[in-house]
């Protein structure tokens, strides 16, 4: 007869159970937006001197979040008294030049005494005196250059300039 059928060389078995793979789940679900708190502050101040001759104006603002931190400050100093003190009034005076000459009249009268025939002429002014002109000293004031300072701390790095 017939020979029994030979068993196959490879035997198949039922599929094994699927293993469970897990990754570390995020702390924040991606379906819900993150509402991170932010802390802010701002302040402004103007300090004036007596008679409003000078003032210092300051303004500052900060914003802090878990991810970043920002700080801005603006300080301005003004002193209009310096501007007026530097520009002193200038007084200039020059005496007028003498242009008229005076000559005394000649004596023509005769006396019993000897006759005077000489004429007298007053000296003519040759030079006029002019006072020196006061000159201003050239002092120029300009605004202070803008200064910016920035700091950043995050992602393992800190920068400042």
Curated annotation (Swiss-Prot):
Give a short account of what the protein does. Answer: Component of the cuticle of the pupa of Tenebrio molitor.
Q: Where are the sequence repeats?
A: 6-9, 14-17, 35-38, 87-90, 103-106, 112-115, 121-124, 130-133, 143-146
Concerning InterPro entries, the annotation shows: Cuticle_C1 (IPR022727)
Task: Give any Pfam family that matches.
Answer: Cuticle_3
Keyword Chloroplast in the entry? The reply is no
| Protein source organism | Tenebrio molitor (Yellow mealworm beetle)
Which Gene Ontology molecular function entries are recorded, alphabetically? structural constituent of cuticle
Question: Which protein are we looking at?
Answer: Pupal cuticle protein C1B
